Amino acid sequence: MADAEDIEPLVCDNGTGMVKAGFAGDDAPRAVFPSIVGRPRHTGVMVGMGQKDAYVGDEAQSKRGILTLKYPIEHGIVSNWDDMEKIWHHTFYNELRVSPDEHPVLLTEAPLNPKANREKMTQIMFETFNVPAMYVAIQAVLSLYASGRTTGIVLDSGDGVSHTVPIYEGYALPHAILRLDLAGRDLTDCLMKILTERGYSFTTSAEREIVRDMKEKLAYVALDYEQELETAKSSSAVEKSYELPDGQVITIGAERFRCPEVLFQPSLVGMEAAGIHETTYNSIMKCDVDIRKDLYGNIVLSGGTTMFPGIADRMSKEITALAPSSMKIKVVAPPERKYSVWIGGSILASLSTFQQMWITKGEYDESGPSIVHRKCF
């Protein structure tokens, strides 16, 4: 690591739904692809076709009709390490086209990630990919960096999991972190269910991707759910049409806001959990009374599931209703919040003050995987 100046660190944000990867110092990830590994459902009969036993990311996505798709990350936490290794391999060699043994690698993890998981990540990086140095950072903390703050509460909601993470002067407060197993994938499932009730059939993993696209293009959060339902009944103002890959056209109306409403009312899908607004409030209430004012004034949204139009206004309205009446409440929804975890990682890994924080290969060889708990907190 003597000539560290000219070697850019790699930043890889492994999400449940998408992998975001690129070089530290860039303002956006170079590679963004789905966290999927697909294996053929049928055996190949065409000789010389060069069929692979596994496809990763976009290639798996484009051949989804003949593959069984698996997501190695569930609810933000890696559950299948062999597939995860395939994804990392694809990231380094095919997407970024770099040799990982020449670059330090910054990985991200979900808050409250099990200790064994961080160790396994560390072990794979050093032993399989031979990286010279690595670091594991908490996703929500990186989002806060990206918004230019060191204090605030981050609501990070991706495809697999949502978290509220209060951060004071750069330190996450672990006792007040709350996790909600309700995120983008559940909303996609919910929309699939609503559409199935209407007589459309969406069941396979490939069809789920169509519904996800429909959700991303058409769904929004209502400021007042009940009132919006009334409007939808009486007029066709909320109706929009969507063309399926086979040319069929679906018209969706109230479904557009019924689906993201689940974030605020998990009971709609039979979940006994508090909505994202209440979880955020509960998280703030678990913090010291002296810092709550700073948290209420810096509620930062991050992750793809916070991209719905109307979510920031609704969040602001709901939290204002829960908080003390004199409290000043500010919900920040940065336009780049889909990638703010990655951007925060890019900022962190390129800071000169961060360079002594890396776990080096030497330190790993000396202490083993448990070093990650001492150096990354």
UniProtKB/Swiss-Prot annotation:
Its main location: cytoplasm. It is an enzyme of class 3 (hydrolase). It is found in: Cytoplasm, Cytoskeleton. One of its GO terms (molecular function) is ATP binding. It holds the Pfam family Actin. Disulfide bonds: none annotated. PROSITE patterns: ACTINS_1, ACTINS_2, ACTINS_ACT_LIKE. GO terms for cellular component: actin cytoskeleton; cytoplasm. It catalyses: ATP + H2O = ADP + phosphate + H(+). Actins are highly conserved proteins that are involved in various types of cell motility and are ubiquitously expressed in all eukaryotic cells. Essential component of cell cytoskeleton; plays an important role in cytoplasmic streaming, cell shape determination, cell division, organelle movement and extension growth. There are at least 13 actin genes in potato. This is Actin-101. The gene is AC101.
